[in-house]
Amino acid sequence: MDSLPDAVVQYILSTINNAKDVASCNCVSKKWKDSMPYIKSLYFPRSIFDSLKNGQTSDCVVMQIVSSTFQLEDLVVYCPFTSAGMASWLLVVGSSLKNLELRMDNLVEQNAPNDSNPSKLDCIQAARNLESLRLWGVLMVNAPKWDVFQNLQNLEIVGARLEDLALAEALRATPNLIHLVLLGCEGLRTVWIELLQLEHCKLDFYGSGSCLLTLRAPKIEYLEVQGCSLIRVRETNSLKNLSLANNAGRVYMVDFGKLMALESLSIRGVQWCWDAINKMLQLASEVKHLYMKVEFTGDFEALLPFPEIDFVDFFKSHPKLKIFDIHGAMFAALCQKNSLKNVDSSFMIPCLEEVAVTVRSPLNAEQKMNTLESLVKFGKKLKKLKIKILGMKSGHSSADDFFEEICRLRYKNHRLISIE
C-alpha cells in the first residue's frame, strides 16, 4: 500500500466519507494514515457508536476523528452528541466548514443555555463560513446567538419547535439565503420572512393550519407553503412555481402581486374561502400547469360546495394551460353551468395537452359527460385524458350507468382516454 502513487491514494480517499471507514483507513498503512488529514468530507451515521466500550463517548470519538483532518469542508453528524462536544469539534474545524448537517435531537425543553453551557444552536456560530446548513430535530424557542452568516446560501430545518421571534432573529442572521426549507415546524403563529436573495422556498407548518405568513423575497422563483390561513407575497415578478396547501385549517386570504411569470400553480386543502380561490385563478392567467384539489369552500365553519364555473370562460381566461389536474369539487363546479349548449364555433382550447379528472360522485352525470366530451372536442392538442374514478361513491343507483358512459367515451377515444 505504501507504494501506491499519491494521486491514487488521494482519489480512493476522496470517495470515502463514512467515519467508520475513515477510521479503518488509518490501519491500512503509514502512507494512508498520513493522508487522513486531507479528507474533505465526514459522515457519522446514527448507529455508528452503538457498541462503544471502555468508557468511550461519541463526543470523544467524533472529536478524535474530526481533529485528525485538515481543512474539513463537509460534516454530517447523525449520531448523538452533546452541546459541549459539539462546541469542541466545531472549534477545531468550524472555520473551514462549508456544509454542515446535524441531527440535533433536542425537541424537548432542556436547561437554559448560558455562557458556560451554550446551546447546540449557539455553537453553530463557530462555523462562520458555512454555505449550507441542515438541521434535524430543532428546539428554537429562544433566538440563537449568531452573528451574520454572510456566505450561507442554503438553510434547511426539518422537525422543529419554533417561536416567531426566534425564527425571525435566526433568519436575520442569514441575509443571503437563496434556498430555504422549513419542514414539520410547529409553534409558529405569525411568520415574517424578508430575504432579498431568496429564490427557492419550501415551508411546512405543523399544527392547526392558522399560521399567518408574510414573505418579502423579490427574486423568489419557487414557493411551496403548507399550513397557513393567510398568505401575503407581494413581490412576485420572478415567481414560476407556486404551491399552496392547508390540510388542517382553512385558507381565508391570499395577497399576491402579479403572477405574469407563473408556469405552475397547485392549490390543495380541505376548505378554502371562494374569494381566495377565485383570486388565485384570476392572477394565474398565464399558468401552464394547474393542479386543484380543494374539497369545499365557505368563509366559516360550514363546508359549502363550489359555485358554478363557466367552462368556456375558464379556458378563455387560461389560454396557455397545458396540464390540468382537477379533483372532485372543482370538476363538479365546472360541469354545472350550462354554457356548452351554445358555444361559439370558433371556441377552442389552444394549448391543453394533458388532463387528469377525479370524479367523486355520479350525480349530474349528464353534465359531467358533456364536460368530458367537450375537453376532447375543443382540446385541439389534447394528448392524454385520464379519468380517475377509484374514489367515486358507488352507492347511488346511477353509478353503473355513469361508469358505462365513461367506458363508452373511452372506447371511442381509446388512444386519448384512460380510466384509473
Where are these regions (language model features)?
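Leucine-rich repeat
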Residues: S3-Y11, T15-E186, W192-E194, ...
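A generic structural motif
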Residues: L102-D105, M292-F296, I326, L385-M392, ...
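Canonical position 11/12 of the leucine-rich repeat
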Residues: M140, L162, G187-L188, S208, ...
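Acidic, glycine-rich loop-and-beta core segments that form the ion-binding/anion-interacting portion
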Residues: S208-G209, L213-R268
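C-terminal effector modules
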Residues: V376-E420
